[in-house]
Amino acid sequence: MSTHADDARFKLALEQWLLLHADDPTGVSFVEFAGHSCVVKRYRAKWFSPLIAGLKFAKVVVLSWLCWLLMGERPSPQRLLKNNLQDEAQRLVRLKDAGSSVPKVWYHAPEVLVLEYAGQDMPYLIRMATPEGRLGLMSRAAQELANFHRAGFVHGGAQLRNLMVSDDGTATRIDFEENIGEALSLPLAQAYDVFQMVSSMAGLRGHEFGLNERQMLCHQLLAGYLGANPDPMVRAQLISIEKHFAVIKKYLGWCLKSIPGRDIQGFLYVANTLRLSLCDE
């Protein structure tokens, strides 16, 4: 499939590149075809792919039960595993047809997906911005996710790294491999998107901002989202998640604070953000 069917130069350049790189390993490449900046995602099966698939299924089963323990819903592992390049291409086409700001799909095949280049990732912009500029970026990211949710959609990969901004200021959501939207109820899936967004800010690498600013940026993200999308069902799911986090922090907080690492410390930031933003409930 190609939306550049009438662009012979684009098709020729793409075909030549795919032929030249037919044996390339799994990965992502940034390539320009006939003046069009593109992102090429490739998947190459290997002899040990069945083993990887088995480990992946085991991981998904564990995550499914963990989701049930923390959020009250157990998503189907089979649905969560609908996350190959073809699945992503189909989701992107549906979202694009519905008017969402997602990359155009130039071409897709079982092991190849070619998308339009969407711009610079949000984490880079956050690191380069002034403190005031970062607050503005938090408001922008929160508003973009709120708009996406109000339209009835779920991202499933709502980390800040998957929000791109082009030179003209257009924001585009990328990376729709995960099938969270079909595996969970809509309110919980959207609440999970919010959690991913805030958690990604909590764990964002960078020496440009200190602990207090990081916590403030997390709070700005959540407050901005709740102000732009005051959906009571999504809020109720966030409150439920906060209660589970509070229990974990109550009994294990003393231990977690002593463990270094972005993931653990990010959990504490998110727990504090949810508590402070939802404390009026």
Predicted regions: what is each one?
Residues 111-122:
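Conserved short submotifs of the Hanks-type protein kinase catalytic core
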Residues 103-112:
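Short beta-strand micro-motifs within the conserved protein kinase catalytic domain, predominantly
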Residues 27-83:
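ATP-binding glycine-rich loop module of kinase domains
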Residues 166, 176-280:
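C-lobe/activation-segment region of protein kinase-like
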Residues 86-102, 123-161, 194:
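Conserved kinase catalytic-core helix
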Residues 1-30:
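Juxta-kinase regulatory segment immediately upstream of eukaryotic protein kinase catalytic domains
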Residues 119, 160, 178:
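Short, glycine/acidic-enriched loop or turn micro-motifs at the edges of active sites
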